[in-house]
Amino acid sequence: MSDRFVIWAPSMHNEPAAKCGYCHGNKGGNMDQLFALDSWAHRYMNKMDVVKIENCTIGSFVEHMDVATYDRMCNMGFRRSGKFLYKVDPLRNCCRLYTIRTAPQELNMTKELKKCISRFATRITSEDYCPAAVASSDFVGKIVNAEMNSKTFYTRFEPALYSEEKYHLFVKYQEKVHQDYNNSPKSFKRFLCDTPFGPEAVLGTQESWEQLNNWQRMKPGEKLKHMGPVHECYYYEGKLIAITVSDILPSGISSVYFIWDPDYSKWSLGKLSALRDLAIIQRTNLQYYYLGYYIEDCPKMNYKANYGAEVLDVCHSKYIPLKPIQDMISRGKLFVIGEEETKVTKELYLVDSETGRGEGFPTDNVVKYKNIAEEIYGVGGCAFKSANESALELKELYGIPYEEEDLDTIYHLKEHNGHAPNGIPNVVPGLLPLWELLDIMQSGKITDLEGRLFLFEIETEGIRPLINFYSEPPNVKKRICDVIRLFGFETCMKAVILYSEQM
């Protein structure tokens, strides 16, 4: 069962945009930026008093998954908060959140970043320290040389577990930097310690921690032994001054959170931590640095572009360099890459191969690409008609309780009396389209889940394999389809779905 993906049935969580931690429902007078596409803004800009702009998240609590599975999930647009695995609905959400990643060789060492490293080296080394000769562009060498010659600064990788020392720094940071006074040991553990990974990934081995804590000495080609969540604690003159919370994945390091002591604000610890993570990635022979989400119209999130980056096109499950598409996503808009001559008639086929996700988009001639998001997901887009047709067939032929959804349910008009979606909507960019789900039914591929997928009903406390999809109750069929749409068919084959008849 070590590779099983044990999850609660997925659900959609909507709350007013005012509760969004990024825009707070206010785009500084540019209210059209609350909409994913211009056609939706034009449709509703004069009806803002009846439109419900929301913060829309789709996800699932995960009881267990392996690190390799989470690596794939990151390359599908997911992030985790403790045990909650989620992604946003980029069509309905008030902000467009794009998975962003970079690599050491992509970093543009600006004057500001060079100063950050230089000041750091000066602070942690003695006056008689003579830096080893390294190329001016070798930021990794400069960081490594300074740290290995410091008698006052060091870091320590350790399991992502609670300690009073870490918690006290967390509270100080939250209160002084974010004016957040609603903290507790329980919330700290839930956010920064709880994980869906097994004990072998959380606790590691003495050998794996020793190797990680000597990352500066790793040889080219040497394989990193530890994969899983970590806390890297920064110490200066014996005092804990910062904590990097990360997940080390087969393809790279995923940044979860960074905590720093406000008394050391002049150190630019946020910039330093990103530079150090990139240095660690290079020396440990990993590939990518996942910086979380990028939001083009949010200063708290768009600084990530400074590290050289590519963002995920969730409809292709592929990455594309950020610079060539910045005009496409300006003013908080949704993008889906397509070739100039491409004419789309339905949502794009979503790659369902575990090996096909997370690759770079072919960008030999980026100029030939255009944004086809309007053609698919705009007011006159092809996605909705196609999805409604598939929804009716899925219901009539296979007893899966999908319903038609009309356009005015997209932004939940306050006075609208038509059918509103129940649960995960029919059309969500980055989820398996309903026409593709219908193909799975019509081809008989759905039977590949039988004997492989397991179901656990909370009321009966009984676990059972799926024996015959077609004979399952409608609500169970729908839950299975939600998992397929959200996480992919191949992942569903190794899933255990926990569900309650009361939910």
UniProtKB/Swiss-Prot annotation:
A GO term from the CC aspect: cytoplasm
Role description: Involved in the post-translational conjugation of arginine to the N-terminal aspartate or glutamate of a protein. This arginylation is required for degradation of the protein via the ubiquitin pathway. Does not arginylate cysteine residues.
Domain of life: Eukaryota
Pfam (any one): ATE_N
Molecular function, one GO term: arginyl-tRNA--protein transferase activity
Annotated family: Belongs to the R-transferase family.
Lineage: Eukaryota, Fungi, Dikarya, Ascomycota, Saccharomycotina
Keywords in alphabetical order: Acyltransferase, Cytoplasm, Transferase, Ubl conjugation pathway
InterPro entries: Acyl_CoA_acyltransferase, N-end_Aminoacyl_Trfase, N-end_Aminoacyl_Trfase_C, N-end_Aminoacyl_Trfase_N
Transmembrane segments: none
Miscellaneous comment: Present with 2030 molecules/cell in log phase SD medium.
Protein name stated in the entry: Arginyl-tRNA--protein transferase 1
